A protein has these predicted regions:
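Short edge beta-strands and adjacent turn/loop segments
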Residues: 57-70
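Flexible, glycine-/basic-rich loop-and-beta segments that form/coincide
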Residues: 5, 17-21, 317-325
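Rossmann-like S-adenosyl-L-methionine
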Residues: 87-93, 97-98, 102-325
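Composition-driven low-complexity segments enriched in polar/acidic and proline residues
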Residues: 1-3, 65-66
Length: 325
């Protein structure tokens, strides 16, 4: 609530948790305003309290809205500090009238934390996912799964990763931090075999389903930390890779993972980065251990901000085996 007691939705002011009221951000889906206004109106009419971070009281913490750029499908997910939404049927009546809404659900987060999402999803109405296309690949997107928010630039980003991978149809590829298989399934169309690794179980469930939906049979997926799965597979099964693709979160790659990549000696490493500082750190390690940065491209995913996605192609050079023992 604002200082006058009115329920508001908006964004955090920079480096604070003070909310600036806003329901019609031009960067979001055009339906956001209608959805947020209906949620706020329902809360006021049904006396549903917004969450207060200071006291840990109140029910509605966040409203997650996702839209399929191609399919126009809309997901509305209320993040709640509890396990039950009062008078939820009245909320459904309001939201299902908005064109495109195909999925309404709740995410349970009862922890006193600033982490947005909890682990439990409660379906309320419609599907528990939406679908979208990137290129000619159809993806199922669940509320807990990572999916890029700028679909136009995402296609360019993944297209650049595919170009740098240099696939001819004979390669074995490992895609680390694969999410719902967005890059993996792009690569699988040109590779002999693709293996994806992701720590979030619902994302891997989506990845497997996405492979099935698209008739892609040369992609396998593993749940777990990339820095644990790949070293284990290499040490116990001596798995091979012609190309390794990494698309880590802002913290970059764990050194145990980088060490295994160097030991596996893929011909090419494609590094997709959302943080230039950790990219520089990881490139320093890889180039010190026999890899050469050959090509680099930046993709402006968030115009008018300081953030940029970077794609780097590294090729295998001479390696000092003493350094990687």
């Amino acid at each position: 609530r604002d200082k006058n007691g009115k329920i508001i939705a908006g964004f955090y002011a920079g480096r604070t948790h003070s909310i600036i009221a806003n329901t019609d951000c031009l960067l979001g889906a055009e339906e956001n305003e209608a959805i947020l206004n209906e949620v706020i109106s329902w809360m006021e009419v049904c006396k549903v309290e917004p969450y207060d971070e200071k006291t840990g009281k109140g029910l509605v913490r966040h409203v997650l809205i996702r839209k399929g750029f191609t399919t126009k499908e809309l997901m509305v997910c209320l993040v709640i500090n509890g396990r039950k939404i009062p008078q939820v049927e009245k909320l459904v009546d309001r939201l299902q009238k908005i064109e495109g809404v195909t999925a309404i659900m709740a995410n349970v987060n009862t922890e006193q934390t600033n982490v947005i999402l909890g682990k439990e999803i409660q379906p309320i109405w419609g599907q528990d996912y939406i679908e979208d296309y990137i290129g000619n690949v159809k993806y199922r997107i669940s509320p807990l799964s990572f999916y890029q928010v700028n679909p136009v630039q995402t296609e360019k980003l993944y297209g650049k990763a595919l170009e740098y991978a240099g696939l001819t149809g004979k390669e074995t590829v490992w895609d680390l931090y694969c999410g719902i298989g967005t890059i993996s399934l792009f690569l699988a169309q040109k590779a002999k075999q693709v293996y994806g690794v992701e720590i979030v179980p619902p994302a891997i469930a989506d990845a497997k389903d996405n492979a099935r939906r698209n008739g892609i049979q040369n992609a396998e997926f593993y749940v777990g930390k990339a820095e644990e799965i790949l070293p284990h597979k290499y040490e116990t099964e001596n798995v091979k890779a012609d190309v390794i693709v990494v698309d880590p979160p802002r913290k970059g790659c764990d050194e145990a993972l980088l060490e295994t990549i160097v030991k596996m000696q893929p011909e090419r490493v494609v590094y997709v980065s959302c943080d230039s500082a950790t990219l520089a750190r990881d490139l320093k390690y890889l180039t010190a251990n026999g890899y050469k940065a050959e090509r680099l491209a930046t993709v402006d995913m968030f115009p008018m901000t300081v953030h940029v996605e970077t794609v780097v192609l590294l090729s295998k050079g001479e390696v000092d085996s003493k350094k990687i023992r």
